[in-house]
């Protein structure tokens, strides 16, 4: 029996399409014949419906997954205010505990063939006074997929984030170019530069280029991602 796969999705910034790309990956894995589940372990920004607190990002992931996890497993830490998680957690009296998330991830792996873990904000967003999301990725011990919001400044953000991932001893399984600014000048040249540098310095391939979509259509975006190559990388990276 093949061991379950998993990956950690991070981004060059907040609001650059991590949830959108994570949903596209889930659709892609499902088309690849895999049972795909999502974890959004820390979500900041909740709304109440029918007496239940929910999160829009988590809702989008559930809609894309073909294995839907119980809310308390999918998102063990749901914070109400839409702000930096460590700030909101302190205000709401919540301790963002990595061990709890690792336990949820372990359970999720028993229910699916592949588990997509979406971070919050960028790679070094704090969780508390001493730990950040990079520490969570290390604790999970899974490869990372980097979502690059293609806009002015993205080259520097992408290379810095890739360096931070490597500094934690994690494998960068690949990156996705997500066009968030349709008016950006020289997008092709920017992507070509990132493709060359990330391949040379980190061996990280470009998994796909997603054009600006309004409204976002993760099911369509899934067809633009090299899921087969990513699955092979994830399998090779297994201990």
From Swiss-Prot:
Compartments it resides in: Cytoplasm
Keywords for this protein: ATP-binding, Biotin biosynthesis, Cytoplasm, Ligase, Magnesium, Metal-binding, Nucleotide-binding
Enzyme Commission (EC) number: 6.3.3.3
Positions of ATP binding: 15-20, 57, 118-121, 178-179
Gene Ontology biological-process entries: biotin biosynthetic process
Names of the cofactor(s): Mg(2+)
Pathway: Cofactor biosynthesis; biotin biosynthesis; biotin from 7,8-diaminononanoate: step 1/2
One of the record's GO molecular function terms: ATP binding
Chief location: cytoplasm
Positions that bind Mg(2+): 19, 57, 118
GO cellular component: cytosol
Catalysed reactions, as listed in the record: (7R,8S)-7,8-diammoniononanoate + CO2 + ATP = (4R,5S)-dethiobiotin + ADP + phosphate + 3 H(+)
Catalytic site: 40
Family statement: Belongs to the dethiobiotin synthetase family.
Functional description taken from the UniProt entry: Catalyzes a mechanistically unusual reaction, the ATP-dependent insertion of CO2 between the N7 and N8 nitrogen atoms of 7,8-diaminopelargonic acid (DAPA, also called 7,8-diammoniononanoate) to form a ureido ring.
Subunit note: Homodimer.
Protein name according to UniProt: ATP-dependent dethiobiotin synthetase BioD
Organism listed in the record: Burkholderia lata (strain ATCC 17760 / DSM 23089 / LMG 22485 / NCIMB 9086 / R18194 / 383)
Lineage: Bacteria, Pseudomonadati, Pseudomonadota, Betaproteobacteria, Burkholderiales
């Amino acid at each position: 029996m093949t061991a379950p796969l998993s990956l950690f999705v991070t981004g060059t910034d907040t609001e650059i399409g991590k949830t959108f790309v994570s949903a596209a990956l889930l659709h892609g894995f499902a088309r690849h014949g895999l049972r795909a589940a999502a974890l959004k372990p820390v979500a900041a920004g909740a709304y109440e419906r029918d007496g239940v607190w929910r999160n829009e990002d988590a809702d989008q992931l559930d809609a894309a997954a073909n294995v839907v996890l119980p809310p308390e497993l999918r998102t063990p830490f749901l914070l109400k205010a839409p702000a930096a998680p460590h700030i909101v957690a302190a205000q709401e009296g919540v301790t963002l505990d990595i061990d709890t998330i690792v336990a949820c991830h372990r359970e999720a792996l028993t229910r699916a063939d592949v588990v997509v873990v979406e971070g919050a904000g960028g790679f070094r967003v704090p969780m508390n006074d001493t730990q950040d999301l990079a520490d969570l990725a290390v604790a999970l011990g899974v490869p990372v997929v980097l979502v690059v919001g293609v806009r002015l400044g993205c080259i520097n953000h992408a290379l810095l984030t890739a360096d931070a991932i490597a500094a934690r001893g994690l494998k960068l399984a690949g990156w996705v170019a997500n066009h968030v600014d349709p008016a950006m000048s020289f997008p092709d040249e920017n992507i070509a530069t990132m493709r060359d540098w990330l391949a040379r310095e980190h061996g990280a391939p470009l998994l796909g280029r997603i054009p600006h979509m309004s409204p976002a259509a993760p099911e369509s975006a899934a067809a633009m991602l090299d899921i087969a190559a990513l699955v092979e990388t994830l399998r090779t990276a297994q201990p």
